[in-house]
Amino acid sequence: LANVGNEHYRKLTHGTGFFRYFFNKLKEGATGNGPIKRMFITGVSPVTMDDVTSGFNIGANMSTDPRFNGIIGFSEREVRDMLSYYKDVDMLAGEVDEVIGVMKPWYDNYCFSRDSLHEPMYNSDMVLYFLNHYLPLKKVPENMIDNNIRTDYNKLRHLIRLDKKMGMNASIIQDIVTNGETIGTIKTAFPAEDLAKPDNFKRLLYYFGLLTIRGTKWGSILLAIPNLTVREQLYSYLVEAYRSADLFSLEMDRLGMLVASMAYEGNWKPVFEYFASELKRQSSIREFI
């Protein structure tokens, strides 16, 4: 969908398309005395569930089953046990609580069921990335985010539908970045033609790991940014969106130096003067203002 568009997607997933054929063969192999007795399928998006597995009625969707909330990722107890082991063998430079305090805001707070709010999970890939740097070098990595876990912006470009008005989905990302959370519902399946609808866009952000379940509000699920790693990703998506739509552009190296000067030396005025001058120069961006 993101790379080659709807027509190619439909050829794969409808009629005699390869993807649908593959799932039909799985069903055939698991029926009666077929060779497949058990299967566990991961990475199946809600779009796949609707468009490909409509006849695949031999399985159960466990995505939001609280019994499987901890199947992938590390609980805090598991992270502490791991750190305690390295501390006992003199490989951990800091104290366990100190290291947890560094990792938690960046890697924790994933929840996949409203009944598992007491059991937030750490992203295991990011925890191992951190330890792979921290243990041998005895210091926190300069970059807390592993580039391998970044969701490809091109996967969202198709859904944001960038144009001169930016589209509603880009506004949803902007609102989520501003407030840190949004109200939504989670569906296990919806068709590709409904993919770009605002409600489904929120659901897809959840399935991409960019939102997580924080609780309930007004009878709906409260979806929130889980940690600083994801917040940084969403900021970068907004920057890419503005650049791609040619609505607003900034010289990022210059802005970075101005922000650093504000942070370390208290020179706040040049930052806002730069913003003001660019807003004036790029006067066609009323949506941004």
PLM ranges: what are they?
Residues 2-4, 32, 46-52, 213, ...:
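Flexible loop/turn segments at secondary-structure boundaries
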Residues 36-41, 45-48, 104, 118-119, ...:
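Beta-sheet entry/capping signal
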Residues 1-12:
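Conserved P-loop NTPase "ATPase switch" module shared by AAA+ and STAND
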Residues 11-19, 75, 201, 289:
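Phosphate/oxyanion-binding active-site loops and adjacent basic polyanion-contact surfaces
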Residues 59, 121-289:
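Extended alpha-helical interface modules used as scaffolds for assembling large macromolecular complexes
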Residues 46-54, 62-132, 175:
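Amphipathic alpha-helical segments of the small helical/lid subdomains adjacent to P-loop NTPase cores
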